[in-house]
Swiss-Prot record:
Name of this protein: Putrescine hydroxycinnamoyltransferase 2
EC number, UniProt record: 2.3.1.-
Pfam families: Transferase (PF02458)
Record GO terms (molecular function): acyltransferase activity, transferring groups other than amino-acyl groups; hydroxycinnamoyltransferase activity
Family to which this protein belongs: Belongs to the plant acyltransferase family.
Role played: Hydroxycinnamoyl transferase that catalyzes the transfer of an acyl from p-coumaryol-CoA to putrescine, to produce coumaroyl putrescine.
Length: 319
């Protein structure tokens, strides 16, 4: 795969003085994968003035202004008390985010978006290289890459201990709004970084069975169906396929119908014996909407739970 040419690399600090101190991280933040989440956004040029489209100065200035309401992203991952055994937190140092500009004379937007599949090569091209995700690392790194067609790829790497995908999208929306001309104080929805809203209760009380937090069961004997190397894939279901699937599931919701199909396929692919093997289904539940509505805020942290369903591998072949 071809490379891109890096033009500039700098650290962009908030445009104004921001609050100092530390932001406490909840158990949900600490349970998240400690690492950077890469995201790429594709933009087509919306006019004839190529120089003005995604002009580096305007994007850099917008980033500095967006970091004012999102000031924790300009900080560094830290440890409470400064010792090696301290609880992980955000140190609001105001140091800034890494900002990289680049260009590619090889790629056009259509080259990248035709049958787009996330891959390591795509990340290496359009997302800045990240440091080890441990204190005192930066929390936000961005790269703006101009393509030969005039389009732009915006790549971001955000530390997952600090924000999740919804929070990252909120930041990108705010940044874009500012670049289009909105004042920094007019963020679409002001963020809330009080992670203590999700603090655990003082006395632990486990009211339900949570297999996702229990030790993993002993692995089944390896065979051809389970010993192979894992692979990632994006499987697209058309509207017609989903409709037929839901009809076969007696009017079940899209989520339930697709999950049922995945469950059956997993059982078959692993050649699990019916009624003698448990299959665990883990899915993500985002509670930010509930928190936002209940407290009338826009919570910005990891409001993600991973409930797990467990059942015997038993099915009637219907698909």
């Amino acid at each position: 795969m071809a490379t891109v040419e890096v033009l500039t690399s700098e650290v962009v600090a908030p445009a104004e003085e921001t609050p100092a101190g530390a932001v406490w991280l909840s158990n949900l933040d600490l349970a998240a994968r400690r690492g950077y989440t890469p995201t790429v956004y594709f933009y087509r040029r919306n006019g004839d003035d190529e120089a003005a489209f995604f002009a580096a100065d305007a994007v850099r200035d917008g980033l500095a202004r967006a970091l004012v309401p999102f000031y924790p992203l300009a900080g560094r991952l830290g440890l409470a008390g400064g010792g090696e055994d301290g609880r992980v937190q955000i140190d609001c140092t105001g140091e800034g985010a890494v900002f990289v500009t680049a260009r590619s004379g090889h790629y056009a937007l259509d080259d990248l978006m035709n049958e787009f599949v996330p891959c390591d090569e795509m990340r290496d091209l359009f997302v800045p290289p990240t440091p080890p995700p441990n204190p005192p690392c930066a929390l936000l790194l961005v790269q703006v890459t101009h393509l030969r067609c005039g389009g732009v790829v915006l790549g971001m790497a955000l530390h997952h201990s600090v924000v999740d995908a919804r929070s990252a999208a909120h930041f990108a929306e705010t940044w874009a709004s500012i670049v289009r001309g909105a004042p920094a104080g007019d963020a679409p929805v002001p963020p809330c970084f009080d992670h203590k809203l999700l603090a655990a209760r003082p006395a632990r009380a486990v009211l339900y069975d949570h297999p996702e937090y229990k030790p993993e069961p002993a692995p089944a004997p390896a065979h051809a169906a389970t010993a192979s190397t894992y692979a990632s894939a994006i499987i697209t279901l058309t509207k017609q396929q989903v409709g037929a699937l839901k009809a076969a599931c007696a009017g079940a919701s899209t989520f339930r119908a697709v999950v049922a199909l995945v469950w059956q396929c997993a059982c078959r692919a692993r050649s699990l014996p019916p009624d003698k093997a448990n299959l665990f289904l883990l899915y993500k539940y985002i509670s930010e909407d509930w928190v936002d509505i209940q407290l009338n805020i826009q919570q910005r942290d990891n409001c993600i739970y991973a409930p797990t369903l467990k059942a015997n591998c038993c099915f009637t072949p219907t698909f």
